[in-house]
Amino acid sequence: MRFSQDDEVLIKEAWGLLHQIPNAGGEALARMFSCYPGTKSYFPHFGHDFSANNEKVKHHGKKVVDAIGQGVQHLHDLSSCLHTLSEKHARELMVDPCNFQYLIEAIMTTIAAHYGEKFTPEINCAAEKCLGQIVHVLISLYR
């Protein structure tokens, strides 16, 4: 999928919003764990604390946000940019692909919770489009 110039501007704006939230990734993961408790099974090393304040959740959340940032910087070559991550999740970790959609929901909710009306429908749409493409790349090796 190609992103239009307008999409790219809005995606970068959405990324700017996400990136400004302290511990955005940890907060999004904690939301996902709360809404979809089955996702906790992939993170036994987190112990029993799946809150955004857990240092391990924060650390993994930062990895998630950094990976999204890499995707945003390489919108025209997401496959190459995210190939290693896709390989790891598909072959090594064997993450159920539906979990990526759960994470998208949690990320979008995190941005909306922090920015309200500033997270306009246009930015929301572009962010979903971008995250959807990132997920598409991440699950591409499952076939």
UniProtKB/Swiss-Prot annotation:
Q: Which InterPro entries match?
A: Globin, Globin-like_sf, Globin/Proto, Hemoglobin_a-typ, Hemoglobin_oxygen_transport
- Please state which protein family the record places this protein in: Belongs to the globin family.
Its gene is HBA
Q: Ubl conjugation: is it a keyword of this entry?
A: no
Which GO molecular function terms does the record list? Answer: haptoglobin binding; heme binding; metal ion binding; organic acid binding; oxygen binding; oxygen carrier activity; peroxidase activity
Domain Globin intervals:
2-143
Q: What does this protein do?
A: Involved in oxygen transport from the lung to the various peripheral tissues.
Q: Where does heme b bind?
A: H89
Q: Which Pfam families match?
A: Globin
What's the protein here called? Hemoglobin subunit alpha
State the coiled-coil residue ranges: none
Q: Does the keyword Ligase apply?
A: no
- A GO CC term assigned to this protein in UniProt: hemoglobin complex
Keywords (A to Z) from UniProt:
Heme, Iron, Metal-binding, Oxygen transport, Transport
